[in-house]
Structure formats: C-alpha cells, structure tokens
Amino acid sequence: MTQSLADMRREYTRDGLSEANAPSDPFSLFRQWFDDAVKTERLPVEPNAMTLATVDADGYPHCRILLLKGLDERGFTFFTNYESAKGRQLAANPRAAMTFFWPALERQVRIEGSVEKVTPEESDAYYQVRPLGSRLGAWASPQSRVIADRAELERLLADTERRFADQPPSCPEHWGGYRLLPQRIEFWQGRPSRLHDRLDYRRQDGGWLRERLAP
C-alpha cells in the first residue's frame, strides 16, 4: 500500500438532511435520492448497484453486489438464480438487508426486511427484456457450484446456445425475482466532523415512524 489506511479520510460537506425537508413516506425520499444519484453519479458507476446481505444456516452473513431492478409501494426487487447460495439462504431464512452508497452525493441508504419471491409472470417479464447473452447465461451457469475451470463454463454456454438455436430461451424455473419488503429504512447524509445526519424509518401500526439517530 502506498498510503496508510489510518490516514485515508475525507470531509463530507455537500448537503444536509433535516426532518423538516424529509417526507413521512421513506419510499418518496428513496425515489428522490435515487433520481439524484442517476443525475449525479458518473459512469461507469451504476446508481442501482447495492450490497445484499443474507445469512446462512450457521448464522454467518454473506454480502454481494447486485442491481436493483424494481421498486414500488411493496418493496425493492432484484433477480437471481434461486439455486444459488443466496437463493438457498433466502429459502431457509427469508430476511435480508440492502445498502446503497452514492459517494458523489455523500449518501447511503440501508434497508432491512423480509423477502418474498415475485410471481413467475414478473420474473418472465424481466427475463424477456434482458440481453440474449444474459438469458442464455441464466440457463448455462450452475451458479455458486464448483466447476473445474473457465473452459467448463464456456462448454456449458455452447451447449445452451445449441439447445436454443432454433427458439428463444424461456425463463428458467430456477431463475427469477425476489422482493424485499422493508421494515426499516435508514437514510444517511455525510456531514462535517463525522457528525452525519441519520433519519431512520420503521414500520409501526401500518405506517412509518421516523426518528433521528446519533451518528
């Protein structure tokens, strides 16, 4: 390393987050922040990239980067292989957490809640708009399984291409979407001297309770 980790820091001075300007509905604030990120974050950064955390049967957390592909009043939607490590973990423990970080805006959003599968129709609708290579890959890759080498993966893809040479691939039963139903959403805005703004929304009595947290 060319620089000490202990010396790596920056000041956050871009913006603030006050209760007076924050809506009572966290979905409204998320959409506002997401739109800001789309306008501000420079390519190749993906504003819809987020860290998804799940827990395995032994209680160990697992994190990976995924892309958010849907948002409505029910929750946050992403797609994956149901037989992958994350799919097996969600089948055993259907709870998860997401984190979005938009460094250009000095903002972070943390989301926690339960997870459900979307309908097959929703999965198929998204699958059909994916690039052909991605659709074939969903069939070819035994996600999270041990394989011998890259050549094996390429052989699996070649077999899949031959299989669907005369017809478009359909959405596999082992592939589809999940929707995270939030119970808690926290918005973090970087501020000077590490005295950051944190607004926490929690489900309560059919609505949302909003509270400020100490940084």
UniProtKB/Swiss-Prot annotation:
Top-rank taxon: Bacteria
GO molecular function: FMN binding; pyridoxamine phosphate oxidase activity
UniProt key word Nuclease: no
Pfam families hit by this protein: PNP_phzG_C, PNPOx_N
Protein name: Pyridoxine/pyridoxamine 5'-phosphate oxidase
Reaction catalysed by this enzyme: pyridoxamine 5'-phosphate + O2 + H2O = pyridoxal 5'-phosphate + H2O2 + NH4(+); pyridoxine 5'-phosphate + O2 = pyridoxal 5'-phosphate + H2O2
Summary of the function given for this chain in its UniProt record: Catalyzes the oxidation of either pyridoxine 5'-phosphate (PNP) or pyridoxamine 5'-phosphate (PMP) into pyridoxal 5'-phosphate (PLP).
Entry's family note: Belongs to the pyridoxamine 5'-phosphate oxidase family.
A biological process term (GO) from this entry: pyridoxal phosphate biosynthetic process
The organism's taxonomic lineage, starting at the top: Bacteria, Pseudomonadati, Pseudomonadota, Gammaproteobacteria, Pseudomonadales
Annotated binding of substrate, by residue: R9, R10, E11, Y12, K69, Y126, R130, S134, R194, L195, H196
Keywords: Flavoprotein, FMN, Oxidoreductase, Pyridoxine biosynthesis
Cystine residue pairs: none
Subunit note: Homodimer.
Binding locations of FMN: R64, I65, L66, L67, L68, K69, F79, T80, K86, Q108, Q143, S144, W188, R198
Enzyme Commission number(s) of this protein: 1.4.3.5
Originating organism: Pseudomonas aeruginosa (strain ATCC 15692 / DSM 22644 / CIP 104116 / JCM 14847 / LMG 12228 / 1C / PRS 101 / PAO1)
Cofactor(s), by name: FMN
UniProt pathway: Cofactor metabolism; pyridoxal 5'-phosphate salvage; pyridoxal 5'-phosphate from pyridoxamine 5'-phosphate: step 1/1; Cofactor metabolism; pyridoxal 5'-phosphate salvage; pyridoxal 5'-phosphate from pyridoxine 5'-phosphate: step 1/1
